[in-house]
Amino acid sequence: MIMKTKAILLGTAALMFVLTSEKAIAQIGTPYIHDPSTIMECDGKYYTFGTGGGGLISEDGWTWNGGGVRPGGGAAPDAVKIGDRYLIAYSATGGGLGGGHSGKVLTMWNKTLDPNSPDFKYTEPIEVASSVNDEDCDAIDAGLLLDPTDGRLWLSYGTYFGFIRLVELDPATGKRMEGNKEIDIAIDCEATDLIYRDGWYYLLGTHGTCCDGPNSTYNIVVGRSRKVTGPYVDNMGRKMLEGGGKMVIAAGNRQTGPGHFGLFKVADGVEKMSCHFEADFDRGGRSVLGIRPLLWKNGWPVAGEVFKEGTYEIESERRGYALELAVDFVRMEYTRHRFWEKDDTPVVPLKSQTLEDVIETWPQGKINVRIGDYMFRPHQKWTITAVPDGGGYLGGPYYKIVIEGTNRALAATADAE
């Protein structure tokens, strides 16, 4: 079976994968980017834009390569779809770029993100926020939220040089709402983004230092508020205006410096988060796009782990039994010891049952599956590997599931699909 998106979404709701051996895998292609925008889907493709202009494109969400087009240069863009158009916000300078904290945030529209489309054309940029050299805020690192409760559009911006600020934009024009005043909502972070869930607004900020490869200390933290304007408070009651923030994701899996959070909703109850990692050790320390499951625990977002290739027990989450081939149980030979009699013979570990011990007893052709008590037997051990050149879905490849050491693949249907 090739484990496609639908199978994953349905299967993981009822199954738990217990890892017995592992191999981490990362996205393929050339996913090199810094300060990525929230991922957008447009006409069946995925797009994200980064610092310096340009961006990445993916046909399936797994293989990423260059080709995205975003004029204006500058830093740390973000994107949101409003109706049938895409609004892009980016920073012209700021963050110490050009020698100071003077900067501005601009917005522009496009009907499509596909540079090969005849409809591809950006509007002229509009300035919506600015900062001067001696100001206690940098106009950089834009984050966009289209509020699902009332349709209002919000822009957060700023760096650890000063305050994170919030302004309201007109969702019809992308311009700053007339008379709107900035609101300070956080300090000691940058690259903020806002999301809404179940009556709470969540402010995700990137804490720590950037732009130093494997030495970057970036991590993503979060606070929440009942009002979009704050105050944002973490799980310990600390205000983000006083440096609070609960950890969402830090370094791991030989990748350091996660920053620049973005949310992508795959389906009801299924969410992914995007970010960059300042240094991927397995890619020479380059900055790469990262995509992780976004999980929720006690009302707080936390990054899930990337699914790892390996050999697993596949366990029913509801009943706790293990998925297994429906084959005859093969008894293991062992030396019997009477419980009530003294036995001075040396203790020798039993060897586990091997595939060679049982495979000749298995029928040829298709074999049904069932659930049963897990006894770490060969008919209960499943190896899950990415399908070479098989494509993928947002943040992962398609997988094949076989009994360990065999080519007996798990099929989703009786027709071997």
What are these regions (language model features)?
Residues S316, L350, I401-I403:
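Short beta-strand segments that buttress and anchor functional surface loops
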Residues F329-M332, L355-P363, D389-G392, A414-A416:
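Beta-strand repeat architectures
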Residues M16-K23:
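C-terminal segment of classical bacterial N-terminal signal peptides
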Residues M1-G11:
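Bacterial N-terminal signal peptides that target proteins for export
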Residues I25-R331, R338-T345, G372-Y398, N407:
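Carbohydrate-active catalytic/glycan-binding domains of CAZyme proteins
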Residues L323, I359, Y399-V402, L410-A412:
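Hydrophobic beta-strand segments within beta-rich accessory/binding domains
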Residues R336-W340, V348-I359:
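Intrinsically disordered, low-complexity Ser/Thr- and acidic-rich flexible linkers and loops
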